[in-house]
Regions:
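N-terminal accessory segment at the very beginning of proteins
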Residues: 1-192, 196-198
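Short, acidic/polar
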Residues: 202
């Protein structure tokens, strides 16, 4: 269905993962907890749900609402969305900025007009202090409360889950986490911003 890249394309840079110090794992009758000095992830044994706590500021930026689902439609994650929470990212989503209450496609529609997706990126960030990047080129859909208010539903046409969750309070910090994985974008010289491209927005 999709052409194969030769050599295979990669999302991650070669030195994507930072060393993490002070990782601890503990367990009780109800939960398995993985923590670092800055972040705590709590997995509920019975339900399979999890939440992520930011130990730096005592907040819970991320909470799952259902187990990870694997089916014929791919892999799906479902998170809680708050009333005062906003979502950004997904690459070039023409005509869209904040995705709250909307659904976006993570697939190249080769459409440069309003509603098109010209250069998708499997990454978004939330004003609650977290970001998610899927390590896949497969098509995806991210629903930020269009079908059901208060719920974020993320899906990719993939038969496994490979995603990074970043926890940081400020957008710049979350973007730096993203760049740690993918590499920093290149700043073009002034002559690279050619005037002819302006016709795409008339």
């Amino acid at each position: 269905l999709y052409p194969e890249a030769t050599p295979p394309a990669k999302i991650l840079v070669s030195s994507a993962r930072r060393a993490t110090l002070g990782v601890k794992v503990r367990e009780d009758n109800s939960n398995v907890v993985i923590e670092t000095p800055k972040v705590e992830i709590v997995f509920q044994k019975e339900s399979g749900l999890f939440n992520v706590n930011d130990k730096k500021n005592g907040t819970q930026p991320l909470r799952s609402l259902s187990q990870v689902r694997f089916d014929s439609e791919g892999t799906t994650l479902t998170f809680k969305a708050e009333d005062n929470e906003y979502f950004f990212g997904g690459g070039v989503q023409n005509g869209r900025f904040s995705h709250k209450g909307k659904k976006i496609a993570i697939v190249n529609t080769n459409n440069w007009v309003d509603g098109g997706v010209a250069s998708p990126t499997p990454f978004y960030w939330s004003t609650k202090g977290y970001g998610v990047m899927w390590n896949t080129f497969k098509p995806g859909n991210y629903d930020f409360g269009e079908e059901e208010k208060g719920k974020v539903t993320l899906n990719h046409s993939e038969n496994y889950l490979d995603a990074f969750i970043m926890i940081n309070k400020e957008p710049v910090e979350l973007l730096n986490d993203f760049y740690q994985l993918t590499g920093h974008p290149v700043l073009l010289p002034k002559f690279g911003f050619y005037e002819g491209h302006l016709n795409a927005y008339n």
